[in-house]
Amino acid sequence: MITSSAQRIADYRQRGWWGDLTLHGMLRHHAANNPHLLAVADQPNRHALTGDAPLRLSFTELDHASDNLASQLLHAGITSGDAILVQLPNIAELVM
């Protein structure tokens, strides 16, 4: 899904703000170069929001979780270009 005009995309690329890496490509890059660094962390009150303990995920753990979610979506028949809705509180899973 593309949400920006062709003119804006060209402008941002020309300025160097946007490149060719996808969001998952950037995650994969950080997982390869900084595998054990903290990528995402829940806020301390996660238990109040979900009943679960706060999560802290390294870039490698986030990359694996992202791959797992992608596999589950493909298994459910969701493919590239399909629009989906995500509704979650402000928790680590929101970035997967």
Stretches found by the model and what they are:
Residues 1-25, 43-45:
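Flexible, non-catalytic linker and terminal segments flanking ANL/adenylate-forming cores
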